[in-house]
From Swiss-Prot:
This is ATP synthase subunit J, mitochondrial. Belongs to the ATPase j subunit family. Mitochondrial membrane ATP synthase (F(1)F(0) ATP synthase or Complex V) produces ATP from ADP in the presence of a proton gradient across the membrane which is generated by electron transport complexes of the respiratory chain. F-type ATP synthases consist of two structural domains, F(1) - containing the extramembraneous catalytic core, and F(0) - containing the membrane proton channel, linked together by a central stalk and a peripheral stalk. The chain crosses the membrane at residues 13-32. It is a single-pass membrane protein. It comes from Pichia angusta (Yeast). Keywords: ATP synthesis, CF(0), Hydrogen ion transport, Ion transport, Membrane, Mitochondrion, Mitochondrion inner membrane, Transmembrane, Transmembrane helix, Transport. It is found in: Mitochondrion inner membrane.
Amino acid sequence: MKFLGVKVYRFPLVKYYWPFFVGFGLTFYGVAKIQNAMMDTAEFINDPRHPRFKKGDLEKK
């Protein structure tokens, strides 16, 4: 059976690989939180590449 050109297999993918999907989600979330925390440290808060400059917040913090 094909759906939008993709072959459908009858293998229960989620049943066997759910720990990997959960691990990916937790890792992605953790890395994003660490990245945001590192961006707001004293060393990088006034870097012109900081996303707050794109928002128009030019005050030094």
